[in-house]
């Protein structure tokens, strides 16, 4: 098996510093652990200029799309990494919940007014990875990447960016899809379903939206500063927009035959003092109800 090559760079705890250099590049993507404020994640990963951009077609089956992804991985070729790094080249992207309809026969009652593919991935032959345990940042190159492209990336990240970031702002207030009365009525129906034994948990959510203008990267940086989370990401879209994701939860991780999920269930209010915080945390940890709910979510 071929081995990836590695080029060290100055360590930067905040991946936004490096990502700003490539944020306008095609297929720019950042997987962000929220450092230096959030402390759970170990690695950040960013890349751009994918070899291929792959989106599921409206009438394409999920199995056919997944096979296309596998075929592209095969064409890239397997490679090992010389260090304990999480990426040797491969696919980065998103699978929406609606992608499930490409796999299963499910009812479709929501109107598609975003017109985004239900899944989109890029095939990447390089990445810049920061390891916050070892305090290192380095470029990782798949062995198939041309020498000229490796040198271009080394020179690019050895420089600085002076681009001005266009401020991001909402040009109208956020508005929900459901009115307050519609939301209340839906909650009442859910309670009736639970009391009747038809279900025992409902993930009831709604969408808020507003007109906006400016650079989506500026919006991401503002959200990141206000609420750093260990499972965050920024993915640019070919049409000029972006997908921004900031979550304290890991939905699922599959590695070496093991599956891990990190849901968060159960809350307590912040206290006025550190002692109150500690007492609330101890109460939460000792709560049979909250533990049972968390175990139920893991089982599901």
Predicted regions and their residues:
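Extended alpha-helical targeting/anchoring segments
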Residues: 1-300
């Amino acid at each position: 098996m071929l081995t990836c090559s590695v080029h060290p760079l100055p360590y930067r705890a905040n991946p936004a510093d490096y990502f700003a250099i490539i944020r306008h590049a095609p297929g720019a993507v950042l997987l962000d652990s929220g450092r230096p404020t959030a402390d759970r994640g170990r690695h950040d990963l960013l890349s751009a200029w994918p070899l291929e951009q792959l989106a599921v077609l409206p009438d394409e089956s999920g199995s056919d799309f997944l096979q296309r992804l596998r075929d592209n991985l095969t064409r890239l070729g397997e490679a090992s990494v010389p260090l304990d790094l999480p990426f040797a080249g491969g696919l980065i992207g998103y699978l929406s919940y609606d992608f499930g309809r490409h796999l299963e026969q499910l009812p479709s009652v929501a109107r598609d007014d975003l017109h985004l593919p239900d899944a989109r991935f890029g095939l990447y032959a390089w990445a810049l990875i920061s390891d916050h345990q070892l305090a290192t940042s380095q470029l990782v190159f798949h062995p198939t990447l041309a020498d000229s492209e490796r040198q271009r990336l080394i020179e690019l990240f050895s420089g600085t960016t002076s681009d001005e970031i266009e401020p991001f702002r909402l040009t109208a207030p956020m508005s929900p899809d459901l009115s307050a009365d519609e939301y209340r009525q839906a909650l009442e129906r859910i309670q009736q379903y639970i009391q009747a034994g038809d279900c025992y948990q409902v993930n009831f959510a709604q969408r808020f939206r507003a007109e906006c203008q400016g650079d989506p990267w500026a919006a991401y940086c503002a959200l990141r500063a206000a609420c750093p989370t260990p499972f965050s990401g920024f993915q640019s879209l070919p049409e000029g927009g972006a997908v921004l994701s900031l979550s304290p939860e890991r939905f699922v991780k599959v590695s070496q035959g093991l599956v891990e999920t990190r849901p968060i269930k159960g809350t307590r209010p912040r206290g006025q003092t550190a002692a109150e915080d500690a007492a609330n945390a101890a109460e939460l940890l000792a709560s049979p109800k909250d533990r049972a709910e968390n175990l139920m979510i893991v089982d599901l």
